[in-house]
Amino acid sequence: MAKKAADVQKGGGFLIEDVTYDQMYTPEDFTDEHKMIAKTTEDYIEQDVLPHIDDIENHQFEHSVRLLKKAGELGLLGADVPEEYGGLGLDKISSALITEKFSRAGSFSLSYGAHVGIGSLPIVFFGSEEQKKKYLPGLASGEKIAAYALTEPGSGSDALGAKTTAVLNEAGTHYVLTGEKQWITNSAFADVFVVYAKVDGDKFSAFIVEKEFPGVSTGPEEKKMGIKGSSTRTLILDQAEVPKENLLGEIGKGHVIAFNILNIGRYKLAVGTIGASKRVIELSAAYANQRRQFKTPIAGFSLTQEKIGTMASRLYAMESSVYRTVGLFEDNMSQFTAEDLKDGRQIAKSIAEYAIECSLNKVFGSETLDYIVDEGVQIHGGYGFMQEYEVERAYRDSRINRIFEGTNEINRLIVPSTFLKKALKGELPLFEKAQSLQEELMMLMPEEPGSGVLEQEKYIVKQAKKIALFAAGLAAQKYGKAIDREQEILVNVADIVSNVYAMESAVLRTEKAIAAQGAEKAAQKVLYTEIFVQEAFNEIEAHAKESLIAMEEGDSLRMMLSALRKLTRVTPKNVIQKKREAAAGIFEAEKYTV
């Protein structure tokens, strides 16, 4: 249903607005069509991909190419490609579900993700009509495989520092590209590369480069810690001849494409961590049930229950946050006509509105998965260190996610800087909110949360938002334009905001479930929410305290810490018991349950 612009939540608006559960999309809102698409993908992964995972891990890439073509036949490569160019033109929820299900396929999910995401979407969103007609049907069918070439040996996070050059030849027919691109996923078998280079040495631009163009080659396979079943090579451009019409977008506007595609890559990465996390919990619960020590299944030990309870509660918050964000994309796009959305740039712009949420999801998702795989190995004990057990590969494969799509450090810094830009543009009244909060804090008498289900959690979310504004406002006031040099404080603020978004997402999802089916049927969700909110609030307090200590001293510090104590004063719940209760349902089902 179309929404008016006034009803669509602004990116970052969650920090200053009271959001209600009926404004949030949740996994419980999946339609029958969504579930059918998810089941189709799941069946394909189980029946076609998993039997060949070991071969793929050993670089038998002919399986990767064949399986991508099979995915194309099923329509799984064309979810984000409009129907007029051979795709399915599905909504973003469907696309996200396909990505989540693919993530069970280990390294192969990287081959899929690089193809349908960063490899194809630059053409979907920014390609000319001729480029779309030429390339998208083959990319949607799997006849052609795509790759994305941005990183260079000397430019990782600083993408605009690229050294690859593009010079128009004397005939004016071809750009001549010279340089090297590093760590290019799918490079062993990709047919089409989206490549960034500087026209005349200074105009950062994007090009569509085919592997058969003169001067295009790849180096040997990289030897990696994880994701061994994905192809990673250097793309070598030795005076590569690229037709003039293969310029993607405008000269000097490559950064617009790169940064928009990074936003998409970030949220898709977060979606992938959901499926990977579910798989590790599944493996860990099943192992804990069958592994006996001291004549008892280790699932019966409370420390194992603590691990599973924590893993699942973090996953619940992550899953809630990610699908909330995808729902925001849909809401934002619903205000446009079908004709408007034929312009892919409009879709990219709709997603870019939520750059903050994309970065938050990327960081929170990758670090949650890292925590889950680490504990998964621990539950497996020595067997978790052995390659014959799937959790060993999951542990190695997880680590790259904190580096992909902009390091987590860069993404953390993006959060406060984007908030600041929105405030300066008048898009979010952050300064006004922070100022009124500081005045309020000097007189604030601690409130008392209600005693009903989730009342304390809703109160904590409200207080956590105040803490975020308190810390951010104080930092902006103290450092002004020099705030970008205080990276530790900026990262603390980002972590506070990240926990706020995750907590609120979990609370709203559970509140929505209670409204739909009652508290008893939502009992597992309530447990996850209570556990996560309390532990995240403890982290928020620690981040805020560390920042205040760095910014203030003496009487001023004591006054600020006193204000913080007013905001964090709640009676803790018994999360040890709640984790035991949450784990019981997971061990019974031998999978993540809600």
From Swiss-Prot:
Its EC number is 1.3.99.-. Pathway: Lipid metabolism; fatty acid beta-oxidation. The active site is at residue 405. Belongs to the acyl-CoA dehydrogenase family. Keywords: FAD, Fatty acid metabolism, Flavoprotein, Lipid degradation, Lipid metabolism, Oxidoreductase. Induction: Repressed by FadR in the absence of LCFAs (fatty acids of 14-20 carbon atoms). When LCFAs are present in the medium, they are converted to long-chain acyl-CoAs, which antagonize FadR as to its binding to fadR boxes on target DNA and thus derepress transcription. The keyword Cytoplasm does not apply. Pfam families: Acyl-CoA-dh_C, Acyl-CoA_dh_1, Acyl-CoA_dh_M, Acyl-CoA_dh_N. This is Probable acyl-CoA dehydrogenase. Disulfide bonds: none annotated. It comes from the Bacteria. GO terms for biological process: fatty acid beta-oxidation. Its cofactor is FAD. GO terms for molecular function: acyl-CoA dehydrogenase activity; flavin adenine dinucleotide binding. It comes from Bacillus subtilis (strain 168). It catalyses: a 2,3-saturated acyl-CoA + A = a 2,3-dehydroacyl-CoA + AH2. Involved in the degradation of long-chain fatty acids.
